[in-house]
Swiss-Prot record:
Residues 501-532 are cytoplasmic. GO terms for cellular component: melanosome; melanosome membrane. It comes from Pelophylax lessonae. The gene is Tyr. Frog skin. InterPro entries: Di-copper_centre_dom_sf (IPR008922), Tyrosinase/Hemocyanin (IPR050316), Tyrosinase_Cu-bd (IPR002227). Activated by trypsin, chymotrypsin and subtilisin. Activated by alpha-chymotrypsin, thermolysin and Pronase. Inhibited by its product L-DOPA and tyrosine. The keyword Signal applies. It comes from the Eukaryota. It is found in: Melanosome membrane. Belongs to the tyrosinase family. Cu cation A binds at H184, H206, H215. This is Tyrosinase.
Length: 532
């Protein structure tokens, strides 16, 4: 605890100004920019828009996907997130080569160096395999992010219509940690309809094909923001391997807070996190008032692990559940929503039963089961990122997505190009991020993005080589078994024939000397051929 306190005290002196990722770049939040609809900030390195003079990028028109979407959201042109980010901006920086960022001032994931030409691969570790110093440093970084205002990004506190179509900007400052809470909220919030009602069956980050790649991108951005705010380029997100867990092993004061001695819903006062305030946790109130979460503190972090609805989630996922999920060969099926059967994505997300792959509305499995089990701030979808356990949980979910990608080796065509729920088609820009990236761009293996997981990296290259062939064998095992059975029967028949022939030969051996040699040979061959 002492080392955590020292790290936190020292790190609060840091305020690093970097290009960043998130929703609205501060440089693009003025009325002038909103009215022009051009978000192409200057890169300070050469004082040109998007770093064009240095060949980093150019300011280009946004070209949204025109592929048809599913019927889950039967409206068009009523939500700011549709065809992201066209409502707010129709021109943004298009970065070139390995450059990245809202002004092309940074490197793509997996690259570093002044010209972004140096490859690097980071390893994410299981939190219980970290040293005490590593764990304490991680907790200190979280607290630092919670207390550091983002220098590059602001959050929207109103719809585009409420901003009078850009002439009256409505934005607010936000700390680095809460920026990502807000991003998760904004992607999953309900839609305001023109008749004054809301539409709940819409989510740009969940319940559809984009769930794994959206959260993969989200975690990478979160990881890089922590690296910047802590001035530690080697920082990686830890994960919690919750397979076969019987309880919340992280819910202690050493990690993310034990239970308060007099209130089951609050955290122990001995934990750093007991002082944390949550945001974006009142969706019903936002809908009633038709407002956007503005980042205002709404109360303490809540958590009551294990005191949940046992009928919905009887237990946490087992190793068998994980293996059953990973064995599903189809990434997406049917309507590609929470009712999809035999879908790896839907089973991983937790809307289908792992053992059968069949969707079940009455149960929460896999990813969803952890959210239900925590029974607090993490159980509210829109505000679930308030709990720091969210990050470790989703990092492990991302590692399972990675296992599936390596085992099944899908091509990009496996990710649906059209007819997915709004926001989830392959070429749809992920909401609400600037710079722009599509869902399909993160349907790739983690090593292509510059990171790996310790338990996957240890498996070695031989397993990576064999996995595709083992998977092919698994898919045709019925045919292999049938061939083996038929082969065994044929072998048995041939052995029987040879045995009978040999016995007949022995019976005729005693009279060989009294018979002509030619006749003996003819009889022998006739008998062999007849038996065969």
């Amino acid at each position: 605890m002492e080392s955590t306190t020292v790290l936190l005290a020292a790190s609060t002196l840091l305020l690093v100004l970097h290009a960043s990722y998130g929703q609205f770049p501060r440089a693009c939040s003025t009325a002038q920019v909103l009215l022009s609809k051009e978000c192409c900030p200057v890169w300070p390195g050469d004082n040109s828009s998007c770093g064009e003079v240095s060949g980093r990028g150019v300011c280009q028109d946004v070209v949204p996907s025109n592929s048809p979407v599913g019927a889950q959201f039967p409206f068009s042109g009523i939500d700011d997130r549709e065809n992201w980010p066209i409502v707010f901006y129709n021109r943004t920086c298009q970065c070139q080569g390995n450059f990245m960022g809202y002004n092309c001032g940074e490197c793509r994931f997996g690259y570093t160096g002044p010209n972004c030409t140096v490859r690097r691969n980071m390893i994410r570790k299981e939190i219980f395999r970290m040293t005490t110093a590593e764990k304490d440093k991680f907790i200190a970084y979280l607290n630092l992010a919670k207390r550091t205002i983002s220098q590059d990004y602001v959050i929207s506190t109103g719809t585009y219509e409420q901003m009078n179509n850009g002439s009256n900007p409505m934005f607010a400052d936000i700390n680095v940690y809460d920026l990502f809470v807000w991003l998760h909220y904004y992607a999953s919030r309900d839609a305001f309809l023109e008749d004054g009602s809301v539409w709940a069956n819409i989510d740009f980050a969940h319940e559809a094909p984009g769930f794994p790649p959206w959260h993969r991108f989200f975690l990478l951005l979160w990881e890089r923001e922590i690296q910047k705010v802590a001035a530690d380029d080697n920082f990686t997100i830890p994960f919690w391997d919750w397979r076969d867990a019987q309880q919340c092993d992280l819910c202690t004061d050493e990690f993310f807070g034990g239970t308060h001695p007099t209130s089951n819903n609050l955290l122990s006062p001995a934990s750093f996190f007991s002082s944390w305030q949550v945001i974006c946790s009142q969706p019903e109130e936002y809908n009633r008032l038709r407002i956007i979460c503005n980042g205002t503190n709404e109360g303490p972090l809540l958590r009551s692990p294990g005191r949940h609805d046992r009928n919905r989630t009887p237990r946490l996922p087992t190793s068998a559940d994980v293996e059953a999920c990973l064995s599903l060969t189809d990434y997406e099926t049917g309507a590609m929503d929470r009712f999809a059967n035999f879908s790896f994505r839907n089973t991983l997300e937790g809307y289908a039963v792992p053992a059968s792959g069949i969707a079940n509305r009455s149960q929460s499995n896999m990813h969803n089961s952890l959210h239900v089990f925590m029974n607090g701030s993490m159980s509210n979808v829109q505000g679930s990122a308030n709990d720091p356990i969210f990050v470790l949980h989703h990092a492990f979910v991302d590692s399972l997505f990675e296992q599936w990608l390596r085992r099944h080796q899908p091509s990009l065509d496996v990710y649906p190009e059209a007819n997915a729920p709004v926001g989830h088609n392959r070429e749809y820009n992920m909401v609400p991020f600037i710079p722009l990236f599509t869902n399909g761009e993160f349907f790739v293996q983690s090593r292509d993005l510059g990171y790996d997981y310790d338990y996957l990296a240890e498996s070695g290259s031989i397993e990576d080589f064999l996995l595709p062939y083992l998977e092919q064998a698994r898919q045709i095992w019925q045919w292999l078994l049938g061939a083996a059975v038929v082969g065994g029967l044929v072998t048995a028949v041939i052995a029987t024939i040879i045995s009978l022939t040999c016995r007949r030969k022995r019976r005729t051996k005693t009279s060989e000397e009294t018979r002509p040699l030619l006749m003996e040979a003819e009889d022998y061959h006739a008998t062999y051929q007849s038996n065969l």
